[in-house]
Amino acid sequence: MGWKIVMKQQKLVEKMTIEEKAAILSGKTVWQTREIDRLSIPSIFLSDGPHGIRKQAGAGDHLGLNASLNATCFPTAATIANSWNQDLGEEIGQALGEEAASMDVSILLGPGLNIKRSPLCGRNFEYFSEDPYLSGKMAASYIRGIQSKGVYACPKHLAVNSQELRRMAMDAVVDERTLREIYLTGFEIAVKEGHAKAIMSSYNQINGIYANEDKHLLTDILRKDWGFDGIVITDWGGSNDHVKGVAAGSNLEMPSCGYDSAREVIAAVRNGKLKEADLDERVGELVDAVMELTSGKKLSDKNFDRNAHHQLARKAAAESMVLLKNEKQILPLDTKKSIAIIGDFAFSPRYQGAGSSMVNPTKVEDMSSILQQYDLNILGMTRGYHRNGDVDENDRKFALNLSMNADIVIFCFGLDEISESEGLDRTHMRIPQDQIDLLQDISKVNENIIGILSAGSAIEMPWNTCCKAILHGYLNGQAGASATLDILTGKVNPSGRLAETYPISYEQTPAYRYYPSNEKTSEYRESVYVGYRYYDTSKVRVQFPFGFGLSYTEFTYSDLIIEEDGIKVSVTNTGDRDGAEVVQMYVGLPNAIVFRPEKELKGFAKVYLKAGESRQLRIPFDDKTFRYWNIKTGQWEIETGTYQIMVGASVADIRLTGMTERTGNSKGYPYNPAKMPYYYTGIVQKISDEEFRELLGHEIPNGRWSGNLEINDAICQMYYAKSRLARLIYRCLTKMKKKSEAQGKPDLNILFIYNMPFRGIAKMTGGAVSMEMVYGIVDAVNGHFMLGVKKVVGGYFRNRRNNKKYEKLLKGAGGKRR
């Protein structure tokens, strides 16, 4: 596909005035685009989210503080990634598209496929994996499903958006090879194989340029290299310089910021800073999308099959849970044995994360209310602990007595709501200590403990010896309770495999010295050694490796055949239960000239086999199997050599190995091993400035904060503001933030404001505040109070006057084209 997109609605664009063109590139409301009535260009509705529709019933707000319509809450992306099942992803996508269409939503903001650089990222539950290949394949399946229902999918957040702390005011410093191989490959697959029709740009800068203003990213890579023919949408409030965004390839600034940005666009065209051809191209792409989404569209069926979608959520959850441990085959449960169920999560499940993706579910199951549907000998159940930290000694004693008298204890525990949320990164990888204290005390009176985990990201598990079995449900959606019991009772054979590594401790992780950034820049010194690529290459022992998961049956691998364009391998179910295996293909190049991980996932297949059944699978090679990005030549190349093809049940459980010769096309190798010794060993936790500079190919940017605050500095940085009032506001915000954290429920509004740059005040207030006023606010914060107040007051009246004038121009459009 050529990168130059022919406008289908060119004649329509030619009829538009410059005021209309500039206005349509910014939102009308929080969730709607702007219509042009005289040309019959309608408004369309956008909505979160990645695992369920979050369309608000009343006035819209970015974080969902107002109630949303009921929708199916499917398991989060982090959960579904563990299924390794692209067909399941597509089926979920179809259901999401159907529900979106029923609510007149034209663009669904998801899936999220940022790379899990660190387990501490507060939004990891929304992302698929630490591996770009698996992330991209699963995202593409969602996208195909969503778009099959006439709704655009909008994968997010392009790109290198791996931390929540000051996400709108942070610069990701990353070398081009790591950018291409790790942080863009998933998006590339989503575009090329999923044919995504929209993309959301991220808040952050990439090497000093905001993602939404990065022409290299949005035009050279996205449109030219990948053939993207859709629209680029900002993250909400993520537009820094709208004119630069339009020039770079961004189509739609969200949410509404009044007409401030439109006036900037018109001024830029008139003074030559923005080519009118670029403006027309962005408008044409957006109008093409709007008309495609609305032309010939029938009235939506306001109903969807709630029960069918609930059952799909149940199936998806069951297929995505990971059995991490099963000593002495304690699972599936013996129905004759007495069972005690302990844990707050058994009564109030944690089935989704917090933030803009939060869904108002059609129904929610909890284990306590559906137990009667299963043939189990339940001795009793109680909380034993409270996830908010409240202590009830009587309940705790009852839990211990109950455990003492039961044959088996099912202990439900995990991360609480404050641990994982948009806008907030974790500070450690531990489960709350009160839960672990109770688990350890129970283990002293009953050795038959089955741990049921709820968490959206990797955790430390020093307590795992207390459990005879561990079933990890992740955040498994509204039907997670029945899915859990289906596995515990043997109705479903677990087939989930970890889509991320579980290290023994946080200090083992490759980026732990660099994450999260507390300065202006976040330095990606670990390069391509993210997740298993690091642990496997540097021989770091982990708790559970990438791709790991147990089953109630056993599988053997045999007869590996390596062909020019792929492999064939036979898999046999040697157990006495039907089950599914995830066959994983890794590729490595021993003694490579260009440093690289020891092995990388390059293909996988999930196969369902009856007891005793054997089947031959084929996993193809593709354009990503042997490639690396050569920073010297600026292109994808293949290094000549004998590649290892490794097939197994996890990155650490390789069953079959073979070799294949490949003739490369490298035109000069990019690195000097003598200057990059640690990158060649994979031991990247303490990369020196000299070695990182060699990797980047240029000086390391100065990431220190300057004395004066600027419009792109975060509001939470007012702790060193010169203005006493600003410091007081900072203390008040911090107090409110800490109060919500102490209560166990994050205040999303406070978190968003806390990490928002000053310019966000103009971008998130619907036109009430202009950028002129923001500059005044910053002047006041920096100690120039009277100057700042003058700009704010004067700017307020000028903004009102100019907005009214712009409205009149739009209403009077259609006469002489300006």
Report the location of each language-model feature:
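Glycoside hydrolase catalytic-domain context in secreted enzymes
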Residues: 1-624, 642-647, 651, 756, ...
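Terminal connector regions
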Residues: 623-670
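Charged, amphipathic alpha-helical linkers/stalks
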Residues: 651-652, 658-729
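Long, low-hydrophobicity ectodomains and other hydrophilic envelope-associated domains
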Residues: 694-818
